[in-house]
């Protein structure tokens, strides 16, 4: 059964139990102190990578420097595009906070890649531009058609390519290079988790270097600074731990761990979530009962309908396996 | 001030319906669960925004509807969409996929495949059983727009469901 099949919502008794139990746990644990500052290792790793990157890519860069105009970081033209796409959805001239956050993520990966002196070739930029323009030929019911968009932006096809297509393509090509480079940093890591780890590094970089510019854009577009995203909770048993990720399955009995395979337990309990392995207790072991706070899903696996990937805010061990 | 055990009673009554509603928006069960969890916590934290005289069912539906739209605009959703286009996953053929789909599944999957704007009004009209005027208020669009989207949605469904006798389509 694929994820997008109505049969997955036939019997929601397990889903209901999970949601109710997570909400109650969350509310009951409000008083607990927030965890220590996150991402210290990530930041150190980032600084180290940047230092090494600076040396290596300086020479590489000289050979690859292009005549193309390098678009600015936090390019407002892209925000204008988001604004039009949002207007299509909400019928008002209002930018969603979620879109502003998207913009920051997009710009952060570009700024971070630039800091690593990753410069795309003209061929890579052209390929990205072709890909970006092809995107508009796909049907997507959450956005206007290409022609409608041109009307909304009041530009011609050529104007759109020049003002939006090319700067975005340059950035897409740049962060393609960043993803490629990240494969060396995060070997044997699932794609959603690796992407999330790199995004965290990139966002930290952007916030450190462009703090004032971000604040000014927030003010201009009336975007609330407060993070409206709630912290959600997933409780369950750790069934697998890898170098950069760990798997939590809800509803598993202690007696089942080790008796059945991980796949069997995921199928039996119809859930399984991989989280990034960051800032977690060193004693974490398979069989531990844990509670993980997260903000959102970061990917799924169509080949395994019950498996998904989520980000992480913090986690704690409720009961150790032995 | 609502107490946790009172919230539990509310969740007992509304959770499955709200997960289903979120699913029809975002078309992914795990994300639908997250959205409903998020909505309950927001509801608990912002009780002052809920007027007792209003209908709780409609209020919770509105929160789920808005949160689902936020999700559809999120970086994560867009990224997953792009990943799926660029790296199409190999689909494992499972035994239950080979089973003939019943009529109800065919109808629901046809609705899931509708464009967003038509899908949204169809969900509220047929599954949430909301009158047009309430849908218009919920989505902050004119009643005439709701009716147009319903009509277009039904036309698209008729094309998809030519061999299925769904009374909704027969009587329209």
Q: Whereabouts are the PLM-identified features?
A:
Chain B
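Short, aromatic/basic-enriched loop-to-helix "N-cap" motif that marks the start
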Residues: 48-62, 77-80, 143
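Structural recognition of an alpha-helix C-terminal capping motif at a helix-to-coil junction
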Residues: 34-41, 54-66
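A short, charge-rich alpha-helical start-of-domain segment used by transcription regulators
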Residues: 1-20, 36, 44
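Arg/Lys-rich amphipathic alpha helix in sigma70-family domain 2
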Residues: 65-83, 100, 152
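A short pre-motif secondary-structure segment
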Residues: 121-125
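C-terminal edge and immediately downstream basic/flexible tail or linker adjoining helix-turn-helix-like DNA-binding
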Residues: 1-8, 79-82, 137-140, 154-172
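Internal acidic/polar
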Residues: 78-107, 112, 131, 170-171
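Hydrophobic-face residues of short alpha-helical interaction/recognition segments
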Residues: 18, 22, 47, 60, ...
């Amino acid at each position: 059964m694929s994820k997008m099949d109505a049969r997955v919502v036939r019997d929601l008794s397990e889903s209901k139990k999970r949601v109710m139990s997570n909400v109650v746990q969350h509310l009951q644990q409000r008083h607990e102190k927030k965890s220590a500052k996150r991402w210290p290792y990530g930041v150190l790793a980032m600084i180290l990578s940047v230092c090494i990157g600076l040396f290596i890519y300086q020479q590489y860069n000289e050979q690859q420097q292009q005549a193309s105009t390098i678009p600015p970081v936090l390019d407002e033209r892209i925000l204008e595009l988001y604004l039009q796409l949002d207007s299509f959805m909400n019928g008002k001239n209002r930018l969603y906070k979620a879109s502003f956050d998207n913009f920051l993520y997009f710009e952060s990966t570009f700024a971070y890649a630039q800091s690593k002196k990753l410069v795309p070739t003209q061929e890579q930029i052209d390929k990205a531009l072709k890909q970006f323009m092809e995107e508009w030929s796909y049907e997507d019911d959450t956005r206007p058609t290409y022609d409608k968009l041109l009307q909304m932006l009041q530009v011609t096809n050529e104007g759109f390519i020049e003002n939006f297509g090319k700067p975005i393509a340059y950035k897409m090509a740049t962060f393609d290079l960043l993803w490629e480079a990240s494969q060396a940093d995060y070997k044997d890591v699932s794609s959603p988790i690796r992407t999330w780890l790199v995004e965290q590094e990139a966002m930290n970089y952007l916030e450190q270097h462009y703090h004032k510019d971000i604040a000014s854009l927030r003010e201009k577009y009336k975007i609330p600074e407060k993070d409206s995203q709630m912290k959600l909770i997933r409780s369950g048993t750790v069934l697998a731990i890898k170098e950069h990720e760990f798997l939590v399955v809800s509803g598993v009995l202690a007696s089942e761990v080790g008796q059945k395979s991980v796949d069997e337990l995921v199928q039996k309990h119809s859930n399984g979530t991989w989280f990034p392995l960051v800032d977690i207790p060193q004693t974490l072991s398979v069989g531990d009962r844990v509670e993980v706070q997260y903000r959102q899903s970061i990917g799924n696996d169509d080949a395994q309908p019950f498996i998904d990937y989520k980000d992480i805010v913090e986690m704690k061990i409720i009961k150790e396996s032995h | 001030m609502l107490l946790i055990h009172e919230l539990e009673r509310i969740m007992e009554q509304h959770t499955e319906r709200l997960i289903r509603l979120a699913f029809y928006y975002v078309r992914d069960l795990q994300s639908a669960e997250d959205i409903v969890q998020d909505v309950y916590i927001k509801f608990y934290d912002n009780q002052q925004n809920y007027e007792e005289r209003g209908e709780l069912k409609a209020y919770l539906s509105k929160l789920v509807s808005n949160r689902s739209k936020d999700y559809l605009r999120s970086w994560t959703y867009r990224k997953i969409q792009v990943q799926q286009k660029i790296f199409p996953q190999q689909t494992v053929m499972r035994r239950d996929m080979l089973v003939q789909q019943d009529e109800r599944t065919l109808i629901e999957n046809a609705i899931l495949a509708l464009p967003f704007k038509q899908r949204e009004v169809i969900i509220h009209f047929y599954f949430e059983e909301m009158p047009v005027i309430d849908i218009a208020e919920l989505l902050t669009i004119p009643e005439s727009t709701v009716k147009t989207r319903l009509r277009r949605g039904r036309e698209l469904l008729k094309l998809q469901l030519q061999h299925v006798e769904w009374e909704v389509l027969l009587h329209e």
